[in-house]
């Protein structure tokens, strides 16, 4: 069942829906400028004089950002998440808001999702699903051979790869029956299985690795 959970494809579907919904919103605002005024809590009668070309310009800008960035951020065929595209997306969006006349692009900017924040969470969740799936195979191997394998290839079954690198997850067993399984996470750097915490004590999803740890539980004496 875990093998059937593909959150990367879920991202693909959701971002296409996001794009369609944004295009529909612009079409509706073009037909009824009062809807545009609702975005700014402004019912100025002059809104009806906004030229169609302005809406068309923002619609083109919106679709450019989706085609060039948000729809390329997750590569379904390669099963990869590409953070560099999210960085480029943010730079382009920031550059547009700093132009001399940012009003030209304001509507498209308002209707674009924060793909980096969405994808960081998808990457975390998909990695967790992958780790749980691999952990199940590790336990099945242990039931059969009385110990965990020395390396993942000993499992002799197809396993998911780290979506941030396209390479196998890092697996580090030890002599005490413990193991560590991790992916490199958003920074795409192997930090040796290091988990980084944010200032509020939560997991820092921008830095460090995404780690699954197993520690065998020892029964108390007498049980």
Q: What does each of the following model-derived ranges do?
A:
Residues 1-223:
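Short acidic linear motifs
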């Amino acid at each position: 069942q875990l093998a059937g959970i593909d959150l990367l494809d879920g991202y693909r579907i959701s971002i296409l829906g996001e794009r369609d919904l944004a295009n529909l919103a612009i079409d509706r605002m073009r037909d009824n400028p009062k809807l545009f005024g609702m975005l700014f809590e402004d019912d100025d009668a002059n809104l009806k004089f906004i030229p169609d070309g302005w809406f068309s310009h923002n619609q083109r800008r919106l679709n450019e950002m989706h085609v060039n960035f948000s729809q390329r951020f997750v590569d379904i065929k390669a099963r990869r998440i590409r953070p560099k595209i999210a960085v480029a997306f943010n730079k382009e969006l920031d550059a547009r808001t700093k132009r001399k006349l940012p009003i030209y692009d304001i509507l498209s900017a308002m209707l674009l999702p924060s793909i980096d924040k969405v994808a960081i969470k998808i990457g975390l969740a998909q990695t967790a699903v992958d780790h749980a799936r691999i952990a199940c195979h590790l336990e099945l191997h242990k039931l059969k051979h009385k110990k965990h394998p020395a390396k993942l290839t000993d499992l002799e079954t197809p396993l998911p790869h780290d979506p941030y690198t396209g390479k196998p997850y890092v697996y580090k067993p030890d002599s005490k029956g413990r193991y560590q399984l991790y992916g490199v996470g958003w920074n795409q750097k192997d930090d040796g299985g290091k988990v980084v915490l944010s200032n509020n004590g939560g997991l820092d999803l921008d830095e460090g690795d995404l780690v699954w740890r197993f520690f065998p539980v020892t029964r108390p004496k007498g049980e």
